[in-house]
Swiss-Prot record:
Pfam family, one: YbjQ_1
InterPro entries named among the record's database cross-references: UPF0145_dom_sf, UPF0145_YbjQ-like
Family under the similarity heading: Belongs to the UPF0145 family.
Name of this chain's protein: UPF0145 protein Acry_1752
Length: 114
């Protein structure tokens, strides 16, 4: 599979949009372990950076982008423009919070402009 370009802007320098393929998305859902949640709760009481949560959110975003690229590639696109994130948290029961991130944008076929 060729690398899919993902950008947050709607235009790419030295390229033109040959065809708009359509909307694409990729979603990832992750949770911390019970121990991680307890340690995070203790850190929240005393203040400070939540490295465990930051790492989890970053990994979730990376997975969402990978899924976005796979979706775009499956439709024959070579780029995604206007990429954005949407995120949320939901209760999976028994006090287990799940973090959900969706990356979305418009799949296109770009051609180089000479």
């Amino acid at each position: 599979m060729n690398e899919i370009l993902v950008v947050t802007v709607n235009e790419v320098a030295n390229a033109r949009i040959a065809r708009v393929v359509g909307p694409v998305y990729g979603t990832s859902i992750r949770s911390r372990t019970i121990v991680g949640n307890m340690l995070g709760g203790i850190r929240a009481i005393f203040g400070g950076s939540q490295e465990g949560y930051i790492a989890m959110v970053n990994q979730t975003r990376d997975e969402a982008i990978a899924a976005l690229k796979a979706h775009a590639a499956s439709l024959g696109a070579n780029a995604v423009i206007g990429m954005r994130f949407d995120s949320g948290e939901f209760d999976a029961g028994q006090g287990q919070a799940m973090n959900e991130v969706t990356a979305y944008g418009t799949a296109v076929i770009l051609e180089a402009v000479m």
